[in-house]
Regions:
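Active-site-proximal loop motif in hydrolases
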Residues: 41-64, 74-109, 118-132, 186, ...
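Substrate-binding/specificity loop regions of serine endopeptidase catalytic domains
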Residues: 19-20, 80, 108-109, 128-134, ...
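C-terminal subdomain of the subtilisin-like protease fold in secreted/lumenal serine endopeptidases
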Residues: 109-112, 119, 137, 144-155, ...
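Hydrolase catalytic cores
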Residues: 96-100, 118-124, 139, 150, ...
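Short, solvent-exposed loop/turn elements at domain surfaces
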Residues: 1, 63-70, 86, 127-128, ...
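Flexible, small-residue-rich helix->loop connector segments that border functional cores
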Residues: 57-67, 94-115, 139-147, 209, ...
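Short, structured coil segments at secondary-structure junctions
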Residues: 3-6, 68-71, 113, 196-200, ...
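Protease zymogen maturation seam
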Residues: 2-53, 61, 66-69, 274-290
Length: 290
């Protein structure tokens, strides 16, 4: 195959995961009173995201969660192609709520409140999938997303050139991409897709309350562009519930929501960045409703 002029390269189809969250609180019942999570408040508050679209390449999304505006018609399941892109894990639903949970007096509210979230299911109920599934998902978004849309990618693995190239191809479409730096407390340059640099691509490290570096977060600038809240983040979860998770998986959606609204700026730098070059803390340049 490698000698075929029509074949760019041959690579093993490796396993990818979203990276284990540092903490998982017991899911809460559906429809508790709405709160504004500390992460949303720290990046400048929430704004109206109605009419804007975020593509969630993850474990799927709870398709009938009362706090999410899910567009399953554009969604796709690359794990089981005959099935709906529903979330049997919870991770993708959690990321979706950080981005776009509705301002509707229940549960939580996202950075771009009420934004449309599209489920691209590439990870299974255990939070893992193959690079071929993920690349297929990225290519699908590239073919269907519009300029100004945003994409969240809260997963990763070792260095893998084909996925890096797929992301560069997607970014060339004018789509803005938020990528989790990873939870291995190592140099993010050792991880794909976190290591990808380019126009419209933002790799995100994680912090805790008090602007303190999250000990699990990957580092190095480049490729990291911004730091965002990632520890003890409350958001939507599977089966219509809510939960608290920690990880760079939670940091990236904060930036995805900001990108969906428009421009991103910074408000100080994170404290304790191990690479000695503190990452700027992401903040929305859009006037907040709260």
């Amino acid at each position: 195959l490698q000698g075929n002029e029509n074949v760019v390269g041959v690579y093993p189809d490796m396993i990818v995961t979203y990276g284990l969250p540092v903490a998982l609180a017991k899911p809460t019942p559906s429809q508790p009173a709405e709160i504004t999570p500390w992460g949303v408040a720290r990046i400048g508050g929430f704004s109206d995201g109605t009419g804007k679209t975020a593509w969630i390449i993850d474990t799927g999304i709870d398709l009938d969660h009362p706090d999410l505006n899910v567009d399953q018609t554009r969604g796709k399941n690359f794990v089981l192609k005959s099935a709906l892109p529903d979330d049997d894990n919870g991770h993708g639903t959690h990321c979706s709520g950080i981005i776009g949970a509705m301002d509707n007096n229940i549960g939580t509210v996202g950075v771009a409140a009420g934004a449309t979230v599209v489920p691209i299911k590439v990870l299974n109920r255990k939070g893992s999938g193959t690079y071929s599934q993920i690349i297929a998902g990225i290519d699908y978004v590239a073919a269907n997303a519009k300029t100004g849309d945003a994409v969240n990618m809260s997963f990763g693995g070792g260095v893998y050139d084909p996925i890096d190239q797929a992301i560069l191809n997607l970014s060339a479409k004018g789509v803005k991409i938020a990528i989790a730096a990873g939870n291995e407390a190592q140099d993010a340059n050792n991880c794909s897709p976190a290591r990808v640099n380019g126009t419209n691509i933002y790799t995100v490290s994680a912090m805790a309350k008090g602007d303190l570096w999250a000990s699990y977060s990957n580092f190095s600038n480049p490729p990291v562009d911004y730091c965002a809240p990632g520890s003890s983040i409350y958001s939507t979860y599977k089966n219509g519930s809510y939960a608290t998770l920690s990880g760079t998986s939670m940091a990236a959606p904060h930036v995805c929501g900001i990108l969906l609204l428009g421009s991103i700026t910074s408000d100080g730098t994170v404290i304790g960045d191990p690479d000695g070059n503190p990452d700027p803390i992401a903040e929305s340049a859009t006037t907040a409703l709260y």
